[in-house]
From Swiss-Prot:
Residues forming coiled coils: none
UniProt organism field: Arabidopsis thaliana (Mouse-ear cress)
Official protein name in the record: F-box protein At4g02733
Classification via InterPro entries: F-box-like_dom_sf, F-box_dom, LRR_dom_sf
Domain F-box: 91-146
Length: 301
């Protein structure tokens, strides 16, 4: 009598297939478990984990916690991938713009919105990789999440399309004191307080950047025509002036709330950035504001 068994089968392969089916069944039961007002899934998790962690030594408990976190992290990642696939299918059917027009639309939105769109689905992510989308990089709405790495990545993506860069926190609190606020202390002589602190501490945003945050502009700065920097706190002059000197095609420069000396910046612009049409420099620690519009230049002390 001939055997009807599959010649390619083996106890090991059969065991693996059974384990996969068993695992699929467990996960399917978990994710399809119906919601019930009388049963809190969260409370069930707590009860099960508390019970499991109540026995065994510390090393076993640690392994259980790590294993649980890892497996639910895998479930979360898998859910996100499946959700993105569904979104890609939906958007590919309902999105009526061709990729060329989509790229143009993406190039008109702020960079935070661009990143949110690119995370929606693969189709939008592919469009968001086009350098034209980074023609205008505006990170003012994402200041809490921006650091050297993010800035460098976006500048690299822009390739030769970069023309405008906005960085920092636009709505950061300004300084209410000017340079004329301190002379009254002369009247008090030696009786003046030994310690005096005026103004606000630099915004927390500045701590996300290092001295080298603008270094990529040494290579791509000549592409920029507009550069706006807001409230980055204290900056090293040389680390700022060297990249700025590469921005020879700037026509619009705005620096607000950055504690650097303004005079060296003006001297550098006079030498290297002769195309400037609009210039606004504000430094509350010096109590000075410089504005240049076309051929008009004036100083507010």
């Amino acid at each position: 009598m001939l055997s009807t068994e599959n010649p390619n089968s083996s106890p090991l392969s059969d065991s693996l297939e059974f384990n996969e089916r068993h695992l699929d069944s467990i996960i399917s039961s978990l994710v399809t478990f119906p919601d019930s007002p009388s049963l809190s899934i969260s409370s069930s998790f707590d009860r099960v984990l508390d019970h499991l962690l109540s026995s065994g030594d510390v090393s076993v408990q640690d392994q259980l916690v790590d294993r649980t976190l890892e497996r639910f992290s895998l479930l979360l990642q898998s859910t996100k991938r499946c959700s993105q696939k569904r979104a890609t299918l939906h958007n590919s059917i309902s999105w009526f713009l061709p990729s060329e027009l989509t790229v143009k639309v993406f190039s008109m939105v702020d960079t935070k919105s661009l990143m949110q769109a690119s995370a929606c689905c693969t189709m939008f992510n592919n469009c968001a990789m086009d350098p034209l989308c980074y023609f205008h990089i505006d990170l003012t709405k994402a200041f809490k999440h921006v650091d050297d790495r993010v800035l460098r990545t976006l500048l690299n993506r822009s390739g030769k399309q970069l023309r405008s860069l906005k960085l920092g926190r636009v709505d950061a609190p300004g300084c209410l004191f000017r340079s004329s606020c301190l002379p009254p202390l002369i009247l008090y002589g030696n009786n003046a307080r030994r310690a005096l602190k005026l103004g606000r501490d630099p915004p927390g945003l500045g701590s996300l950047f290092t001295r080298s945050c603008f270094d990529p502009l040494k290579l791509t700065g000549n592409l920029l025509t507009s550069l706006h920097i807001y409230s980055l706190g204290f900056m090293n002059m040389n680390s700022f002036l060297d990249p700025l000197s590469a921005c020879s095609n700037l026509t619009d420069l705005k620096i607000v709330g950055v504690n650097v000396l303004l005079e060296p910046i003006l001297e550098l612009l006079a030498r290297n950035c002769c195309l400037i049409e609009h210039l606004f420099l504000d430094n509350c620690s010096q109590g000075k504001t410089f504005t240049w519009w076309g051929f008009l230049y004036f100083t507010v002390a």
